[in-house]
């Protein structure tokens, strides 16, 4: 609805802008907090969510689950978590994010304790995820670490993000990766859901 790029807004200014559009999105809409990684700004996130809840705004958090703590306080006012899975293995997660996957597990443990709803998203990178072995591992990972799942989605990896890495002059872990074909991604999702819906496939 509005572009916050290149500007710094305090929480009052953000809430004011959102309030101006409340008649537009009504009872069925709300606010999605994304990034970057919103969990890396816990104090701001906590303050903003408290103010949004006072005006009864539905709040979704789009996150990779990798932050710096205060998860319980953040999640108290979150209605829905849109979880972006980077990878399920410790080594590849480290290579792609330069972070530790255990931090994601910590976030998920607290979210599950609070019975938060999840939409789970997996971006499919052909070189990394387009194989049966990964699908089986992903099924086990989801069933082990994530509860109260409302929906699972596969998204095809694209190269649009390369420009962002170049602009910010930071290393791009996906630089040599190919884009994912949409039809192949859809077929892979169908194959995954057969595994996921098989009651005997859980760990």
Task: Identify the function of each model-found stretch.
Residues 1-8:
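Canonical Radical SAM [4Fe-4S] cluster-binding loop centered on the CxxxCxxC motif
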Residues 8, 122-203:
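Radical SAM enzyme [4Fe-4S]-AdoMet core and its adjacent flexible, acidic
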